[in-house]
């Protein structure tokens, strides 16, 4: 199924680029899947989910070589890429350009180190994770209550 997915994605990107050469593609997955039958696989290798940004004008070294983050950081990254310089935006988490800290449902990354959240010692980071989750859940449940002030 990996060959098929790669083939279909490649055909889609070629067709979209032919239609609009300025298209920006962000491709990621929703879970880690590795076909490695060794027990000597690191948590980083076992848990990593690929994400790439591709399009005209997007350099191959857009992110630091050791950049890591979460899906919640894709939207602010897009904002930084496409908004006019000096334009501001609000986000729960920083963009992938600031990838010192990230988390998912059970893991955290801090300064290039990955671990189980239950083992995280940094109380400030734990509080940030809990706050971001609380706000995200509230927005999912009550998002329609948010109104623009004009």
Regions found by a protein language model. Name each.
Residues 1-8, 14, 46-49, 61, ...:
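Catalytic-adjacent loop/helix segments of enzymes that bind and process anionic phosphate/sulfate esters
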Residues 17-18, 57-150:
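Membrane-interface soluble catalytic domains
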Residues 50-53, 57-58:
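His/Asp/Glu-enriched, well-ordered alpha-helical/loop segment
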Residues 4-44, 52, 78-79:
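Metal-dependent active-site segment of extracytoplasmic phospho-/sulfohydrolases and closely related
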């Amino acid at each position: 199924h990996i060959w098929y997915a790669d083939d279909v994605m490649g055909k889609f990107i070629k067709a979209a680029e032919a239609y609009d050469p300025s298209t920006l593609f962000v491709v990621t997955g929703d879970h880690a899947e590795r076909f490695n039958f060794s027990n000597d696989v690191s948590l980083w290798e076992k848990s990593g989910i690929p994400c790439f940004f591709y399009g005209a004008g997007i350099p191959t070294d857009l992110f630091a070589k050791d950049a890591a983050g979460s899906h919640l950081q894709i939207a602010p990254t897009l904002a930084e890429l496409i908004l006019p310089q000096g334009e501001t935006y609000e986000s729960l988490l920083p963009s992938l350009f600031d990838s010192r800290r990230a988390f998912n449902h059970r893991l955290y990354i801090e300064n290039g180190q990955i671990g189980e959240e239950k083992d995280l010692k940094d109380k400030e980071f734990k509080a940030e994770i809990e706050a971001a989750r609380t706000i995200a859940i509230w927005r999912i449940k009550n998002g329609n209550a948010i109104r623009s002030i004009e």
